[in-house]
Regions:
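Short, structured surface patches at the beginning of a domain
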Residues: 1-144
Length: 144
């Protein structure tokens, strides 16, 4: 399986990304602390962090751009988040980020939810699986 090949053949280098639309900085701090603690418990390597205190409706977010830049440059091959909603609650916005990860053979790891199930119930897993099959790539999520 392509997904297994990434995790077996290449050491995961994760970028921890937190996002909240709350105006309280403590929400982002708590979210990031949770991500880093989970990474430590699972012996995952975190190569960088970024965060956004904004809505997830747009891709024009500095923290998300930093995470994508790290993936694009090969500094990271995965993004660590609490749940898919941290990318976006909107289908098309989340799909664009996941397609970006797929195009760069990178994965998404969710610490608070089962990414595969969450993507399935949001209707995102099937188009990504079909895209992976047609392009010979990977599905952009990893089981915890």
């Amino acid at each position: 399986m392509h997904q297994q090949q990434l995790t077996d053949e290449h050491k995961l280098k994760l970028w921890a990304y937190a996002r909240s639309s709350s105006s309280r900085p403590s929400v982002l701090i708590q979210q990031m602390q949770g991500l880093l603690a989970d990474a430590e418990r699972n012996h995952w390597t975190v190569v960088g962090t970024s965060q956004d205190m904004s809505t997830g409706r747009t891709l024009a977010r500095m923290g998300l751009r930093e995470a994508q830049s790290a993936v694009r440059q090969g500094l990271a091959n995965g993004i660590l988040i609490e749940d898919v909603g941290r990318l976006s609650h909107e289908y098309s916005t989340a799909l664009r980020v996941l397609e970006f990860l797929q195009d760069h053979s990178a994965v998404l790891i969710c610490t608070q939810t089962d990414a595969r199930y969450e993507l399935y119930i949001k209707g995102l897993s099937q188009p990504l699986q079909q895209r992976a099959m047609s392009k010979g790539g990977i599905v952009p999520w990893r089981e915890r």
